[in-house]
Amino acid sequence: MNSASFLQSRLISRSFLVRRSLKRYSGLAKPYTFQQPTIYALSTPANQTSAIAIIRISGTHAKYIYNRLVDSSTVPPIRKAILRNIYSPSSCSVKPHDQKESKILLDTSLLLYFQAPYSFTGEDVLELHVHGGKAVVNSILKAIGSLHDRSSGKDIRFALPGDFSRRAFQNGKFDLTQLEGIKDLIDSETESQRRSALSSFNGDNKILFENWRETIIENMAQLTAIIDFADDNSQEIQNTDEIFHNVEKNIICLRDQIVTFMQKVEKSTILQNGIKLVLLGAPNVGKSSLVNSLTNDDISIVSDIPGTTRDSIDAMINVNGYKVIICDTAGIREKSSDKIEMLGIDRAKKKSVQSDLCLFIVDPTDLSKLLPEDILAHLSSKTFGNKRIIIVVNKSDLVSDDEMTKVLNKLQTRLGSKYPILSVSCKTKEGIESLISTLTSNFESLSQSSADASPVIVSKRVSEILKNDVLYGLEEFFKSKDFHNDIVLATENLRYASDGIAKITGQAIGIEEILDSVFSKFCIGK
């Protein structure tokens, strides 16, 4: 083993010890969390009546709970669905089959038992698939809780938010990025969010982050070899300038990769929060009708009276897998005697400034009012900026083909080819599909995603660590152009970046506060 390889192995030992502490029981009957209390909770939504509810139990006493609930001394079959009666433990003898006539039946349930370490948490896990009535669920949860008896070593408690996922992490079943992917998968509302969450859950981000960390450690090893073995006259470390050059080149390449990744994250965040789509136009051009057509619902009040919509109306819709926050706004006109309407107009302009994409709705039935000057002035203002705009000619069913041609010509003459122009009819639905297709293309461009490529979405925690720890450490490494004069400081900056990645995946030492923050955002039962 050469000096650099030796140093690399020494540098990763800290990470190795952490991983070993997490996974040392992964192949044995006893998981790392063996001595922790057995936990239980409802894994399906609470306070909702449903056909089925799933109660999850995880820990050393899962088999004991099974025996007491079904009044049996047999070992539950592993990974096999069985149908059993569930009884109140207080009505059963500790010795099974005694006093059968006094047993209180709670429900008939489908049971699944997973033996450690081959379960989600890495512990013994028992799942009760019971009927979904609130009374049924509450009675069984109460029955499980009644089995807690610390004096006899039966430490059984109700799970806290994220407890099951925390056990899975502690037993080396998943890293933090995968578990955050599970949470995002549960919370996903659209196809693009689902694809991104599934990518994290499958470990794509984990592999990427681990490769980054390995690159940093390899280059730290090169620098540390110079520090520790400079007096050994080793042939491998004599050409220090070449080593410095290679390390600098490698770290520049890595930094560029992370910056590109962060840019994709920033673009993809729009998918998580929802793309803000605002409809602008003069009064009575059909903005509300278009909102109702796109949402397939009567979100906005439709009337022939100008100024009907006086305030902004937001609605969440799913457009071809994209989460969209669509906003209907008050019609914009220069003068109005109605103070409330003027407030609505002001709010409409502010909403458009905050939007990701604007639909400028025009009415083709009156060429003289086709392009109101006040709206054009707003769209070309510095405040509005260079936002994307699509011109939508509504009410196409009210004009002839020749009249529509005149309208399109006037729009192109005044606006040029800067904005795409589409015609639709909310009455006949003509052009709506074409509009949706154009919107989808813009959404793909805004988020740098497509039907074939998953967007890159990470938690705020991961994003902040990448920025404040990883990139910060790398930038500090470059601050001194002549960094080889202080190799120790340069190496420590790389270590700072490496430790940042370890925080992301959960391999860092002393990360209890990080774990508390991550799992507190999970639901109970997960």
Curated annotation (Swiss-Prot):
Its main location: mitochondrion. It comes from the Eukaryota. Residues 274-444 form the TrmE-type G domain. Keywords: GTP-binding, Mitochondrion, Nucleotide-binding, Transit peptide, tRNA processing. InterPro entries: G_TrmE (IPR031168), GTP-bd (IPR006073), GTP-bd_TrmE_N (IPR018948), GTPase_MnmE (IPR004520), MnmE_dom2 (IPR027368), MnmE_helical (IPR025867), P-loop_NTPase (IPR027417), Small_GTP-bd (IPR005225). Residues 1-19 form a transit peptide. GO terms for cellular component: cytoplasm; cytosol; mitochondrial inner membrane; mitochondrion. Pfam families: MMR_HSR1, MnmE_helical, TrmE_N. Gene3D superfamilies: P-loop containing nucleotide triphosphate hydrolases (3.40.50.300), Probable tRNA modification gtpase trme, domain 1 (3.30.1360.120), tRNA modification GTPase MnmE domain 2 (1.20.120.430). GO terms for biological process: mitochondrial tRNA wobble uridine modification; tRNA methylation; tRNA wobble uridine modification. GTP binds at residues 281-288, 328-332, 394-397. One of its GO terms (molecular function) is GTP binding. It is found in: Mitochondrion. GTPase involved in the 5-carboxymethylaminomethyl modification (mnm(5)s(2)U34) of the wobble uridine base in mitochondrial tRNAs. Involved in the expression of cytochrome c oxidase subunit 1 (COX1). Works in association with the small subunit of mitoribosomes. Belongs to the TRAFAC class TrmE-Era-EngA-EngB-Septin-like GTPase superfamily. TrmE GTPase family. Present with 768 molecules/cell in log phase SD medium. Forms a heterodimer with MTO1. This is tRNA modification GTPase MSS1, mitochondrial. It comes from Saccharomyces cerevisiae (strain ATCC 204508 / S288c) (Baker's yeast). The lineage of its organism: Eukaryota, Fungi, Dikarya, Ascomycota, Saccharomycotina. The gene is MSS1.
